[in-house]
């Protein structure tokens, strides 16, 4: 008897639980037939010009029978060196470094347009977006929420593509430098075509931001336009001012005096969006299903987002009242120090946010991220200390980073042979930025030491690309947290790490960045199928008690607490109209 047959006849009482009265076979494929349909993505225009700091509305046209996935398509303007005001930066080198005759090769590299879009510009530019049916708001979401949700649900396979869709790339979020290569365009140009080349401008780029409304994430919840003959569907969009999306200064020198003080590049902040529109995936149904969809009433179990606004806190112990309704699947909260998002202070030389190249709207930790978005940070140069006063001043983006890290007690003095024990925080370090990537080596005037890049151009590109998802920031601002419902503890007090590590690990696809906290009432909150809720409509008093770290609210420091809740509701559609079954 063959071995396979021996296994086959080795059949006992326990096998009845596995193979008795079988219901499926692995040896004959089965499938189910589906209703015929077609799908097409069609552009929808806004009423009025969509631009930074404006509110625009798009009325969804009835091009198809159902409306499914919806994307914001927006084209960012180019930010280039021609935007530098005339006369800015003259004699900057001599004032900063004390040299009366800076080298000719330095001229024009002390000042320019140093600009970057803040992280995740596609998400950051969205202040608010909402869906209306017949004048009733059905759901409202925020760019901050989109970032948090994608931190929890985005798979590793999707991350690279999503980052490019929303503009979180080195081409857009890494600082420009006048010594870098020009932007490559579609027409004939002498600029390098390789994407790894650092650029002296932020290129005109089209972003695609997917909305996360209930009808966008599940085809079974697609909006039945054919059944809403008497109600219009509108999408209202609020865009942030450009000041909260862009960081652009005329110099990277961290020296404040009349000659060298960096200035805001006003022309860059006067730019408008090149284009903005929505793309909606329309579904076309076959005749029979189309008739049923139009004539029959419908009830959809939908998901909504609840957010009652920021709450300012300035002490370590806080009670946050939760004014939520409906059966909620989970609570998600972040605590963001105000110092992380001080957009005005980020343009003032000497401030921490200036040194790290702008505000950090998606930093939910209790410390500034001191790993800045700059190619310069990955190119180190050895140079004789005396040459700092007489040679090219294009040294110190990394030195300035080291100054910041030293001031934060992250590193000590830089002490290696031939450097003559120069403190990175000393005045002799001056200001400036690192040599261009094309500089292989050079002999400093009067010096005995060559300076040479410790990382190759290819290595620099690898480091910058991998650093997009790397951070040198703080810890979770939440030291402990506890939820109380009608005065009773829903769970015992837990450390903050339980809410930003254990809970996401248990209930979500992905472990998010530090500081994104959650507590889930559902087994699988990402799925539409309900798997557990807490009905906050039946809770009179819900309170989230938070103890925050000293780094977050110590001294005069303040922070904002944002608590989000995802809930179920019922959308009823009948007689050509639609509305919610349960209001707030």
Swiss-Prot record:
Cystine bridges: none
Keyword Cell membrane: no
Lineage: superkingdom: Viruses
Entry similarity comment: Belongs to the NCLDV major capsid protein family.
Function: Major protein of the capsid.
Organism: Chrysochromulina ericina virus
Lineage: Viruses, Varidnaviria, Bamfordvirae, Nucleocytoviricota, Megaviricetes
Designated name of the protein: Major capsid protein
Any one GO CC term of the record: viral capsid
Keywords: Capsid protein, Virion
Pfam families, A to Z: Capsid_N (PF16903), Capsid_NCLDV (PF04451)
Compartment list: Virion
A molecular-function term among this protein's GO annotations: structural molecule activity
Listed InterPro entries: Capsid_N (IPR031654), MCP_C (IPR007542), MCP_C_sf (IPR038519), VP_dsDNA_II (IPR016112)
Family annotation (Gene3D superfamilies): Adenovirus Type 2 Hexon, domain 4, Major capsid protein Vp54
